[in-house]
């Protein structure tokens, strides 16, 4: 009889532990979704700013129409992979706008264009901060998922490692080609 009671208590404690770990993993997933929404908000704001930059640039560079049709309509991504693609697409359009603007000095000196460039810089900082938060949350759940015994619960619940938001490499250069001669 004591063995049966002991077994029931053990199974009950095991079930409570399993539910507790499962709930903790679910909370991590919710936290990741919440922090990813911040990234989506920044991407929408950034999209709107890029659209405004395109309007200003169109006024100066009417014959550069092919550039202006490349703005991808994606404003936010449902998954982390889609968000990475949206960020890449927006960065590509920004690079094209900057390339076109170099051909039009009057565009570069436009107060509206300069204000939009500053706004993009601010939004890039907001995006970087939001990405750090998402990646920190992703790191927490991924560490939990690969740690025993939580990995058992994650496996049973079908929870897999979550991908990180990609770090931007655009604008980062190899320093080996710099001239270090001080003379």
Segments from the language model and where they lie:
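A helix-centric hydrophobic-segment signal that preferentially recognizes long
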Residues: 2-183
